[in-house]
Amino acid sequence: MTVNVYDLANELERGIRALPEYQALVQAKAKIDEDEEAKKLWTEFTEFQMKIQGLIQTGQAPTPEVQTEMQSFNQKIEANPLLKEYATAQQALGVYVNDIERIIFSPLQDIAK
């Protein structure tokens, strides 16, 4: 019996969208989009995250100034109920994503042993 992995992947995608954690994340994002202050801060934060990822990808360590800026962003996000709700929802969905990633990559890890 041949398994169509694309069908399985599409079924997984639908399953993720049906999760209560995914729905909570969608609702939290909609609330951010309706609030200009939260939306602006979230946009600034995601741009800052991309900047840090760029540094890391080029082998550069974040400077103390960048680390201070990250702490400042984290404090602002924790202080904003909409952003805090979104971050919490992201973490909840992230548990599923991490588990799924572990399962999917298990066969490749078996080969690498």
Curated annotation (Swiss-Prot):
The lineage of its organism: Bacteria, Bacillati, Bacillota, Bacilli, Lactobacillales. NCBIfam families: PRK13676.1-1 (NF010209). Belongs to the UPF0342 family. SUPFAM superfamilies: YheA/YmcA-like. HAMAP family: UPF0342. Gene3D superfamilies: YheA/YmcA-like. This is UPF0342 protein SMU_782. InterPro entries: Com_YlbF, YheA/YmcA-like_dom_sf.
